[in-house]
Amino acid sequence: MPLTPPPDFTKVYLSAALGVSLALVVWLLIRSTLPVVGDRDHNLPHGGWYRDGTKSVFYNSPGRLNSIEARKAPLLGQPWAIVVLLVLLIWASHKLGRPNCRACAGSHT
């Protein structure tokens, strides 16, 4: 009985990972995170007013979600500004810090 190598399943795993990734991206793009207001016939996700014979619905529009959407938020309160500031501080401390290696006291550039 000759020895044969085991079958190569890399293409199967790659196809499965690609399919799961594509399904996850599509699900994230099409899902709705808006608050559900109304019933199955009268949906008011962005706010509004509806009235028929026995029913009346008034719903204000959703508020601001976070500091990015706020109009009067301070610049350093913005999440992107904090990230940029931290990146600049790390870069500056690397450039302006000790030029020598702490392990061997040599200069590695």
UniProtKB/Swiss-Prot annotation:
Intervals, Lumenal compartment: 31-72
Keyword hit for Lyase: no
Membrane-crossing residue ranges in chain numbering: 10-30, 73-93
Signal sequence bounds: none
UniProt KW keywords: Host endoplasmic reticulum, Host membrane, Membrane, Transmembrane, Transmembrane helix, Transport, Viral movement protein
Cellular compartment(s): Host endoplasmic reticulum membrane
GO CC field: host cell endoplasmic reticulum membrane; membrane
Alphabetical GO biological process terms: transport of virus in host, cell to cell
Pfam family for this entry, one: Plant_vir_prot
Chief location of this protein within or outside the cell: host cell
Topology Cytoplasmic: residue spans: 1-9, 94-109
Purpose of the protein: Plays a role in viral cell-to-cell propagation, by facilitating genome transport to neighboring plant cells through plasmosdesmata,.
Family: Belongs to the Tymovirales TGBp2 protein family.
Misc. remarks from the entry: TGBp1, TGBp2 and TGBp3 seem to act together for cell-to-cell propagation. TGBp1 is the main movement protein that physically cross the plasmodesma with the viral genome. TGBp2 and TGBp3 would facilitate TGBp1 function.
Protein's UniProt name: Movement protein TGB2
